[in-house]
């Protein structure tokens, strides 16, 4: 597979919001991985050119993506893993510590499988203050950065960005509602 555009794999793809932004930035999304069926259906309807994998990302193997990506690898893997475990909202209605807080490892794994040149993580700012467990003060963000380095993605930049600063017409009562944490490596 040859393409003249920058190429992209969308992990934790949801209904395709990151894909839409990546297309606007000149990327060609080749593969999307999403667990929720209704999100896959919406994604496929909005982006029929993308190979959508409806599966738990932990079960996705190289054989599932290799036919859809260039042999030399992709330019970018995005990983917008579920934010519930990092969100400061609704902490009384969910388990504060669960296995979702380590799903960033799957984004790294897919980046390595696809020989990605770069990986972009996106999540709520709460990811920067979440600890591994009640008894371990190690921050999840520090574990993520360590594992990025171990995987060969040690040159990274972190940023908190407010969506409204980039033309997203979403203002709510709380001015930081759409503040998001990004790490690009």
Please place each PLM-identified region on the residue numbering.
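Short, conserved SAM-binding/catalytic segment
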Residues: 43-52
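Short beta->alpha hinge that forms the Motif I/post-I loop of the SAM-binding pocket
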Residues: 34-38, 57
């Amino acid at each position: 597979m040859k393409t003249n555009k920058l190429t992209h794999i969308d992990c934790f793809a949801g209904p395709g919001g990151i894909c839409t932004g990546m297309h606007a930035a000149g990327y060609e999304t080749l593969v999307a991985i999403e667990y929720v069926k209704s999100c896959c259906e919406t994604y496929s309807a909005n982006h029929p050119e993308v190979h959508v994998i409806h599966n738990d990302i932990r079960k996705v193997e190289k054989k599932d993506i290799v036919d859809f990506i260039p042999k030399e690898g992709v330019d970018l893997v995005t990983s917008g893993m579920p934010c519930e475990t990092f969100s400061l909202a609704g902490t009384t209605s969910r388990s504060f510590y669960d296995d979702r807080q380590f799903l960033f490892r799957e984004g790294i794994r897919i980046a390595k499988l696809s020989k990605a040149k770069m990986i972009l993580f996106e999540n709520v700012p709460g990811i920067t203050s979440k600890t591994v467990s009640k008894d371990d003060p190690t921050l999840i963000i520090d574990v993520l950065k360590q594992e990025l380095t171990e995987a060969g993605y040690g040159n990274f930049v972190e940023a908190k960005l407010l969506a409204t600063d980039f033309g997203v017409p979403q203002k709510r009562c709380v001015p930081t509602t759409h503040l998001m944490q990004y790490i690009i490596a």
